[in-house]
A protein has these predicted regions:
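Conserved glycine-rich Rossmann-like NAD(P)H-binding loop of the short-chain dehydrogenase/reductase
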Residues: 28-42
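The beta1-alpha1 cofactor-binding region of Rossmann-like NAD(H)/NADP(H)-dependent oxidoreductases
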Residues: 38, 59-70, 102, 211
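Conserved NAD(P)H cofactor-binding loop of Rossmann-fold oxidoreductase domains
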Residues: 88-93
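Substrate-binding pocket helix/loop in short-chain dehydrogenase/reductase
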Residues: 96-97, 101-106, 198
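Catalytic loop of short-chain dehydrogenase/reductase
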Residues: 133-171, 183-184
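C-terminal substrate-recognition "lid" of short-chain dehydrogenase/reductases
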Residues: 209-226
């Protein structure tokens, strides 16, 4: 089983770009969403087109419903129908309960939870056959709660619940799964020391290899019983 009509949000950089590389191949069509990483999106497009992949790029701010609607319209016009949606994009800003703002709260909830829900709804209306997948990139913070990154963690906890409830709702024609990575790629605001401390606090005491996340995505797509 393969995915051939793929949408990846936040697909121009980091984990999203790695997933795009993993799922690319001759005659496959991938729509890569980006927001501020236009040059990286264009470079990735050129790279993947050399493998015979058809790449479509679309810009959008996922905290704005008008942009989400634009992305859906563009996806329908290019792909015609869908068989894989990877909700990878996320907003990641640090705040706590005692200093969060309604603006930050709203942007996190809209970007990290409302948009995956809206895209999942539209995905379900534009599929063919029974081998269709939605894969949500969550976060290990959902299972190891801390008071840090408050708005982000709340939004990802909601995405975890969305994953479980949409799996029930969309079965059997759409399988919905989530991946909750541990420390994978150092955030640009992190020091090397802080990042190392973060992954050493995990049971395996190692940084996650992004290729392992990509392999998990591929496994979900190819295994019709999950």
């Amino acid at each position: 089983m393969e995915a051939n009509k793929i949408i990846i949000t936040g697909g121009a950089t980091r984990i999203g770009a790695a997933i795009a590389r993993k799922l690319s191949g001759p005659k496959k069509e991938i729509l890569i969403h980006y927001n501020k990483s236009k040059s990286k999106a264009e470079a990735l497009k050129k790279e993947l087109e050399k493998k015979g992949t058809i790449i479509y790029l679309v810009k959008g701010d996922l905290s704005k419903e008008v942009d989400v609607n634009k992305i859906v319209k563009f996806a329908k016009s290019k792909l015609k129908y869908f068989d894989c949606l990877v909700n990878n994009a996320s907003l990641f800003e640090n705040d706590k309960l005692d200093n969060f703002t309604t603006d930050s709260w709203g942007r996190h909830l809209r970007t990290n939870l409302r948009t995956p829900a809206l895209l999942s709804k539209e995905f379900s209306k534009n599929i063919k056959g029974k081998n269709n997948n939605i894969i949500n990139i969550i976060d290990q913070r959902v299972f190891k709660l801390t008071p840090y990154f408050f708005s982000y963690t709340i939004s990802k906890t909601g995405l975890y619940t969305l994953t479980k409830t949409s799996a029930m709702n969309f079965a059997p024609n759409i399988r919905v799964n989530g991946i909750a990575p541990g420390p994978t790629i150092k955030n640009k605001r992190q020091s090397d020391k802080h990042f190392k401390k973060q992954y050493l606090a995990t049971p395996l005491k190692k940084q996650v290899d992004v290729n392992e996340i990509c392999n998990a995505v591929d496994f979900f797509i190819k295994n019709s019983s999950i």
